[in-house]
């Protein structure tokens, strides 16, 4: 989540949803009575002598006083429903009900009814710390492109051209391409571009895949190699068109969630009394202030009956700087969590 602005006096926060997990934090931020501003579509009403007619749907920027928050799993969007408090006059929307949908890549402004309190700041800090960066290197026959893959797209930083060494059938692919590619890749890492990234992904065409793998091994670079039909700058955009960017980004986070679930389950099975399972048990230890790590299924967070209970637990764990993981129910981590009531907590000390 990227926070674009924070106005303490007005209780305003403006942000961009960067990853799917940010929707969980946004869900925690917005309460009934808060006003959410965002882009949506609204049908025009046209007054004629014969009466009122419905016109086309147009994009408009609206403010909605939230009465209900829901999550649409199919579209992976949060839905904020309530009365419109601010809208362009031409759409005649003020006072009527409307739903603003927010998904990955969307920009939204929230005006908190109760102001920017410590709980809100804590959520924003933790959400901002979840940003993951992927360094993307795309190797083509005549150029190497370098960029950063983010949840809302790709930022190409440089495109470096090169010429293969030697010519003719007597020269192997390795002899012609290994040295120039190795030189460029080495410069990328020496320049510091790989610092503060969570993963390095190298895109390369089928023809040069073996050469590039050998280069990475010789340079000691740990990277995931993804095959594309064409490398270079075109290869980067091929990744985006093919929908692989989402997989690359989610893979940075999901193994961590799975590892945490397995680790806390192991602690639970050890019988040492330093872990509990099930929402009811988690509520108790959260109230006592002894939760070190909390893992909750998104099914509990978005559930009508369990939402308020989960929000209370999250608030208690947030306030004591505990680690929190919210996992999708359909993920491998979520499936392992389900038999234990969708909630696990690792404790600072044993209950035995």
Swiss-Prot record:
GO MF, one example: metal ion binding
Localization annotation: Cytoplasm
Cofactor(s) for this UniProt protein: a divalent metal cation
One example of a Gene Ontology biological process annotation: nuclear-transcribed mRNA catabolic process, no-go decay
Keyword Calcium: no
SUPFAM superfamilies: Dom34/Pelota N-terminal domain-like, L30e-like
Disulfide bonds: none
EC number(s) per entry: 3.1.-.-
GO CC entries: cytoplasm
One Pfam family of this chain: eRF1_3
Keywords noted in UniProt: Cytoplasm, Endonuclease, Hydrolase, Metal-binding, Nuclease
Keyword Metal-binding found: yes
Family recorded in the similarity comment: Belongs to the eukaryotic release factor 1 family. Pelota subfamily.
Function summary: May function in recognizing stalled ribosomes, interact with stem-loop structures in stalled mRNA molecules, and effect endonucleolytic cleavage of the mRNA. May play a role in the release non-functional ribosomes and degradation of damaged mRNAs. Has endoribonuclease activity.
PANTHER family found in the cross-reference section: PELOTA (PTHR10853), PROTEIN PELOTA HOMOLOG (PTHR10853:SF0)
Quaternary data: Monomer.
Domain remark from Swiss-Prot or TrEMBL: The N-terminal domain has the RNA-binding Sm fold. It harbors the endoribonuclease activity.
Name of the protein this chain belongs to: Protein pelota homolog
Organism lineage string: Archaea, Thermoproteota, Thermoprotei, Thermofilales, Thermofilaceae
